[in-house]
């Protein structure tokens, strides 16, 4: 569904699927004709720092590919509901991620949050960070280069307290220091509903 929605809504010339191990199964066989496959070797380390978890290896691969080619990166669970063409004139785009406690749990909160969404009144203390599940980038974007350079301080060993440091917190710090190199979209642009129980 995610791949089909990306194809139908955005109508790209090609959809590149970067992988180390090719998926299998009925749904993969249905999606495969939509894709241009690109087999990669996931890095064991980057900038002299070991990458222990597959998610962190994937984080580095997506940034390296965007640096080399530019384009749109979407996680495999991203469902496109609107085309992204209108955003392609920016050097780099990333969306904010709400803290899980700010996901509406009932209809009253949904109305309240809808009003905030329309008026742009999302408070900064409600934003968890930036999320790398959907990224748009020009080739060799200055922001991608800055982000990749921060991996010299990468320290996560897996699902530890540094798990999302480089995927969520580092980019928001970079964006604060280099607002001219990045376009930030609100939390409802790419990352809603959230990954918590009510969102799922």
PLM segments and residue spans:
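Glycosyltransferase-associated regions of secretory-pathway enzymes
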Residues: 1-58, 76-200
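Small-residue hinge/turn detector
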Residues: 59-71
